[in-house]
Amino acid sequence: MLTSVLVRLVAWSVRRPIWVVVLSLVAAALSGVYVAHHFKINTDISKLVENDPKWAALGHAIDDAFPQRSQTILAVVEAPAPEFAAAAANALADGLRREAEAGRIGQVSEPGGGPLFEHDGLLFLPEQDVATTTAQLASARPLINVLAKDPSIAGLATTLSTTLGVPLQSGQVKLSGMAKLLSRSAATVDDVLAGKPAAFSWRALVDADAAREPARAFVTVQPVVNYGALQAGEQASRTIRATAQALKLDERFGAAVRLTGEQPLADEEFASVQDGALVNGIATLAIVLVILWIALRSKRMIAAVFVTLFVGLVVTAALGLMMVGSLNMISVAFMVLFVGLGVDFAIQYGVKYREERHRDPNLEHALVGAAHAMGMPLTLATAAVAASFFSFLPTAYRGVSELGLIAGVGMFVALFTTLTLLPALLRLLAPPGERKPPGFPRLAPVDDYLDRHRKPILIGTLAVVIGALPLLAHLRFDFNPLHLKDPHSESMATLLALKDSPEASVNDVSLLAPSLAAANAAAQRLGALPEVGRTTTLSTFIPDAQPQKLATIAAAARELLPALTQPAAAPVSDAQRVAALKRASNLLEYAAEDYPGPGAAAAKHLSESLAKLAAADAATRERAEHAFSAPLKIALNQLAMLLQPSEITRKNLPPQIVRDWVAPDGRALVQISPKVPKGADPGDDAMLRRFAKAVKAAEPGTIGGPISILHSADTIIRAFLQAAALSVVSITVLLWITLRRFGDVLRTLVPLLVSGVVTLELCVLLGMPLNFANIIALPLMLGVGVAFKVYFVMAWRAGQTGLLQSSLTHAVLFSAATTATAFGSLWLSHHPGTASMGRLLALALSCTLIGAVVFQPVLMGKPRTKRVTNQSQGIDE
């Protein structure tokens, strides 16, 4: 009955082709207008997964209490010396605060910097370290006095010359003890002479951490985001870069600003999806055209297929927007799905039309005959594919759920246009007759071989597949979303460079406590866990033993501040500067000769470098002046501020810091960082799993970082298992209702399941873990696989033999080729997640195709001999 309805629909379309084409184009035009006015993409990835209310409440509570902490941008200021990095970060933060006042960005802060740490930084050291540091500074008072009096390069050269005189000769100083100073000075002068960015860090002489290159300082910015744009935080990033450029941080400090954090990572991820999309799209279209030409052998038929696809795609887009309101970053893939499966329907009908046209030259008879042969298989395939997509509707993975809804509806649109618009267009375009039927007659011997050796092939295949099942125990899900991002993008490269830095805090988790006292108690409990490296609350910013530390610092300040605050000497002429450099060079040469051993090579090197600097032009010496004198002035000023701290209390903490850790209603935040063993990878999955499990067990209210990622991974895996089970059940019921034979249902499902199992087994063998991106490939291939299996079982039920050489295999192979081209183009994407999806799709499609073309005919065997029976038959059997 259904076949006759479909045949009448095609016959009506063939008799009234102009009406059908006009109505289709009108529907496409109206749909296009709707899409143009309502097209929206929501790039907020937090909306892709629906968490259970209890879990969602934890995240919402922190977001509501501390909205400034979400989707932040971390501006990483890199400079040749920590003095320059700190000064550049301060300048950038001041400039960005003016932008925040204008409303272009949100809150601006300096992690580990700003006035609090500039004045009171020494108070955060342990009491013994404060005593040691101030004692060292006091003993260096004569040197500090000389440096502060004349911090110019001439003054530094003179100080060096003085040191190389009596102090060295009397043994007060040793050349070996000056080795670090001399070698670093020589390296800085060499950079100046080579025209490279150069700065001499005075902090690096006494602080090993400050010696790391490049030196970094940080500014955190809360962006004003627009989730209607592909790159929601792009405007904020532009503001930061423009501010840095306007402040001339590069010229003043040799500083560069790189952006990372949640928002830049998301923005660059979406940008990488776009990157190369046009070229890939054009290449994909060209390859699809070639494949269609080989499959259909007619420009008119190809034109008809493209028009049919375009109309169906526009109508599906309009229906999708009506149903979901706005697309998300996953549901937008419905276009690739529609093209891949829509082309399949068109090729199946078109190839069958070619076969019918070879038998009967009459165009209308061939079009109706193709509908009689393919109407039922196409309808069953559509229903099965749609069922596989609709199986995601009840799951918590909203991104794929909406994709399934749109793609499932799109399959019915594709079927309707294939059975109405495509025949009407072919009737109007009137392709020429077919000289030979489509198919692969050369594969007849393969058909015969498979038929004769059916049982050994079947047993061998199943033995290998079943024998490899233990591999599935090693199938891995990579839950770290950072592995899906382009490591060469600025935001990701910067984040990787910061993997050992607490400012990145990628793997930190958070706990919202009812009060600061409760937060401190929780921090103490969590800090005792072996998996936890550090806990932070507002109380972390209130140092202990402050009276003792303040007294120690005050004693040092009484000795050092007069030297640090004295007026600097007047600048000298360039001639005097040259003379000072030459004298220092000569004395270094003598010292290297007179005191061989450690430090002699560095002295010789610096002697040669200073001689070259003295012989260079005045502009080069000005750059050397900036490289040595500017960091020294900054360092001396920083030291003067550090020697004038004031007691830190809860009341006088900067309001911005308080707001970052305590909400207006009194609730307080605890930040917990994992303990990373020395030399270990901070992103190690096993370590993060242990950390997340331990912290969650100790404090069930913790959320964020690896805890949230693991929860999302569990939710997504559950969604896919639920959808897979629902899909198999719904497809089984659909096939049973349609085919009415349990054996035929198994002949359809077993090859599908075998293809899926083999795909996962090969993932293990090829080292391809599943992840948040490529797992989406599995339901896509389930849909394609169901369609292929349905075509073959319907042909087998109709009594067709020699399936490999048939027009059906011709259609399936070229349909798979177009689908592989559409999906495989993802493999070429610059986005690692999209590329991994393309790889898995290519693998899954290969397994699906082999399962349909080779394994399924072997499983089915020879067609049944039809006989008169009272058994209830399947639809149109």
UniProtKB/Swiss-Prot annotation:
- Which residues are on the Periplasmic side of the membrane? 38-275, 322-326, 394-404, 478-718, 770-774, 829-839
What coarse category fits the chief subcellular location reported for this protein?
membrane
Q: Please give the knockout or disruption phenotype noted for this protein.
A: Deletion mutant cannot grow in the presence of various antibiotics, including chloramphenicol, novobiocin and polymyxin B.
Bilayer topology: Multi-pass membrane protein
- One Gene Ontology CC term in the entry: plasma membrane
Subcellular localization: Cell inner membrane
Which of UniProt's keywords are assigned here? Cell inner membrane, Cell membrane, Lipid transport, Membrane, Transmembrane, Transmembrane helix, Transport
Q: Which residues cross the membrane?
A: 17-37, 276-296, 301-321, 327-347, 373-393, 405-425, 457-477, 719-739, 749-769, 775-795, 808-828, 840-860
User: Which residue ranges are assigned to the Cytoplasmic compartment in the record's topology?
Assistant: 1-16, 297-300, 348-372, 426-456, 740-748, 796-807, 861-877
Summarizing the annotation, the consequence of altering residue 344 to Y is: Growth is severely attenuated in the presence of chloramphenicol, novobiocin or polymyxin B
Which residue intervals define the domain SSD in the entry? 302-428
Q: Quick one: a GO biological-process term for this protein?
A: lipid transport
Q: Which InterPro entries match?
A: Hopanoid_biosynth_HpnN, MMPL_dom, Mycobact_MmpL, SSD
State the similarity comment. Answer: Belongs to the resistance-nodulation-cell division (RND) (TC 2.A.6) family. MmpL subfamily.
Describe the protein's quaternary organization and the partners it interacts with.
Answer: Homodimer.
Q: What does this protein do?
A: Essential for hopanoid transport from the cytoplasmic to the outer membrane. Is capable of shuttling hopanoid lipids from the inner membrane to the periplasm, where they probably spontaneously insert to the inner leaflet of the outer membrane, strengthening the cell envelope. May be a proton-motive-force (PMF)-dependent transporter. Is critical for multidrug resistance and cell wall remodeling in Burkholderia.
Q: What is this protein called?
A: Hopanoid transporter HpnN
Q: What is the lineage of its organism?
A: Bacteria, Pseudomonadati, Pseudomonadota, Betaproteobacteria, Burkholderiales
The protein's gene is named hpnN
